[in-house]
Design a protein with these regions (language model features):
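Aromatic-rich carbohydrate-recognition surfaces in CAZymes
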Residues: 1-98, 118
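Catalytic cores of carbohydrate-active enzymes
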Residues: 92, 98-155
Length: 155
């Protein structure tokens, strides 16, 4: 996994009823990561933000041309898109659950965070190639990776 692991781990725990942590503090961190691009590699290494977030928000997926500098694999745009979409879904569910719990957190419906995250949660669809039915690399122009392009493999 190459995305934002804290959101899926903390969100899953909270939804399942594990509450031995400060969910408000956790939510602050999860929201910061979901909406912030790290300015430097050092910030990313220290767990701040999502890499390639600007492309993810601009296109609704991370295009193949957007290789992530200093990543273990520079060709992980599809995996990163899928994980970010999953993380956005999990965070939206946490916000919705907080809305109906005794735990305090600002109303996500009023701030638009829930709706924004649910829109982003559907971005996984943008890397599903309708002609193959598989998640596949996609270029910034909207075209999908072809067999001829497979000499340079993307995940």
């Amino acid at each position: 996994m190459i995305g934002d692991h804290c959101i899926s781990a903390l969100g899953d725990a909270y939804i399942k009823g594990i509450r031995n942590f400060d969910i408000n503090k956790a939510c602050e961190g999860m929201l910061r990561n979901a909406f912030r691009t790290p300015a430097t590699y050092e910030e990313y290494k220290n767990g701040m933000g999502r890499r390639a977030l600007n492309s993810y928000l601009k296109y609704g997926y991370i295009p193949l041309e957007d290789s992530v500098p200093e990543a273990f694999h520079t060709c992980e745009q599809v995996s990163r898109t899928l994980e970010y979409a999953y993380d956005d879904f999990v965070l939206a569910q946490v916000l919705q659950k907080l809305e109906t719990s005794d735990d305090y957190f600002p109303d996500p419906q009023k701030t638009g965070l829930y709706d924004t995250l649910m829109i982003r949660a559907r971005y996984y669809r943008n890397v599903i190639n309708p002609s193959t039915g598989y998640a596949q690399g996609r270029y910034a122009d909207g075209s999908f990776l072809t067999d001829a392009d497979n000499a340079f493999s993307f995940t």
